Amino acid sequence: MKAIKIAIDGPASSGKSTVAKIIAKNLGYTYLDTGAMYRSATYIALTHGYTGKEVALILEELEKNPISFKKAKDGSQLVFLGDEDVTLAIRQNDVTNNVSWVSALPEIREELVHQQRRIAQAGGIIMDGRDIGTVVLPDAELKIFLVASVEERAERRYKENLEKGIESDFETLKEEIAARDYKDSHRKVSPLKAAEDALIFDTTGVSIDGVVQFIQEKAEKIVDMS
């Protein structure tokens, strides 16, 4: 059976990572969390106090402490920078609020996209992000673009933060998500937009299982036809 490449794009908190992980597990595919890679680069910048003018230093740190993914005993995915487990650190609000400017740096995107394409070559992979279908994997057999209202996405992020023990204010989250949408869709390098051949799916009011079922059915149909 042919193993395909699946690209899932969409704005912040549209449910990309959640459904991508479930589908990867169901299909026996590899899940590559591209967002975690950009968050890791952002974590480096914030930890060292680097600005956009010091991109060479961020890249140097990435080379010294490469990003890797490992599985925890419970099957969840852990993110490492070198030997440091940054799984929780890269989900903190300061990283979330700064990832847009770091991910907009051409040199950072070039390096991480190169790594992502190399990993995806063999197929049987599912990636989620903001430019997977348009830039990273333009040859992906299945491209999905998930959308949802700002209100719904803020609610998801609020619940997610509660589960992780991260304090947050709902109204502030709404403002941050709206601001992130604007930054991501107006940046010069790889702006957030659906690929021309992507299936656009509004997840507002749709359960996780409903989104998973929709994408899996599309994937299985492509595999059956190949």
From Swiss-Prot:
Top-level taxon in the UniProt lineage: Bacteria
Molecular function terms, GO-annotated: ATP binding; CMP kinase activity; dCMP kinase activity
Gene Ontology CC annotations of this record: cytosol
EC number: 2.7.4.25
UniProt keyword list: ATP-binding, Cytoplasm, Kinase, Nucleotide-binding, Transferase
Subcellular locations according to the entry: Cytoplasm
Residues engaged in binding ATP: G10, P11, A12, S13, S14, G15, K16, S17, T18
Keyword Secreted set for record: no
Gene Ontology process terms (BP): nucleobase-containing small molecule interconversion; pyrimidine nucleotide metabolic process
EC category: transferase
Cytoplasm found in the keyword field: yes
NCBIfam families attached to this UniProt entry: cmk (TIGR00017)
PANTHER family: CYTIDYLATE KINASE, CYTIDYLATE KINASE/PANTOATE-BETA-ALANINE LIGASE
Protein name (record): Cytidylate kinase
